[in-house]
Amino acid sequence: MKRPKEPSGSDGESDGPIDVGQEGQLSQMARPLSTPSSSQMQARKKHRGIIEKRRRDRINSSLSELRRLVPTAFEKQGSSKLEKAEVLQMTVDHLKMLHATGGTGFFDARALAVDFRSIGFRECLTEVIRYLGVLEGPSSRADPVRIRLLSHLNSYAAEMEPSPTPTGPLAFPAWPWSFFHSCPGLPALSNQLAILGRVPSPVLPGVSSPAYPIPALRTAPLRRATGIILPARRNVLPSRGASSTRRARPLERPATPVPVAPSSRAARSSHIAPLLQSSSPTPPGPTGSAAYVAVPTPNSSSPGPAGRPAGAMLYHSWVSEITEIGAF
């Protein structure tokens, strides 16, 4: 049985033109891509390896900078090896602390310098303790010298904490006594400084003063410390000491004092003498220190050989020293 023939469409639909170019594009898209050559693949792999190496180098360089800049990471750098995650965590904690404090100290060079100085001192203290433990052994833990040394270093480390505001013109507290501690030929100067309470007791065993009786001395400016030690520097130069002794020697005068117009130097000595008397650590007399008293004086109530009280000789030596130091 034959199937009935369907009616054909219009002539325009059957006789329409066929687009050959569109079929060519479809055939090209369906065609698989060509595989690259082996030389191109090797060049691409090499370029990718170079880029990856540069990226790792930048990461490692940034992490090393963070180890150096973050104080907590810098403190743990010598003891153990830090991982990258630990360095990043310490950096995050440090930035959080800076944000919590309002950013104070981030651009303060002095605060950062003092912080790194205290960190370095604590590292050295740890090494000293470890060295003493290895050298002396566990049996030397009851040694009094070792105990005194460690307690002194611990107290010094506690005092080295950075202060919020600078106390002087210098970035670090001045400690000018190291020159005098290294000079064994100056026992009189060390005794005078110990009497005045300006030398720590671990340096001078014979002094029973506390370790640091004057806390403000550690942060004293260099100008004040230099002014303190200038008068005692006369002991180092024997020629100047002899000249001061000759100046302090009483002059021969007649028994009846002749009225003389007061000179400018006498006026200065009259103004300076009460100040020196009030600021002197010890009363004038035979118990004074040898650096300032050139001639032993008798009782202050008895007149001197030239008809003057004995205290005038001491004031004269003080004034001569001060005027000579001012000229020096």
From Swiss-Prot:
Compartment list: Nucleus
Extent of Low complexity compositional bias: 261-270
The entry's keywords: Developmental protein, DNA-binding, Notch signaling pathway, Nucleus, Repressor, Transcription, Transcription regulation
Region annotation Disordered: where it falls in the sequence: 1-57, 239-308
Signal peptide: none
Regulation: induction: By activation of the Notch signaling pathway.
Sequence ranges of Polar residues compositional bias: 24-42
Record protein name field: Hairy/enhancer-of-split related with YRPW motif-like protein
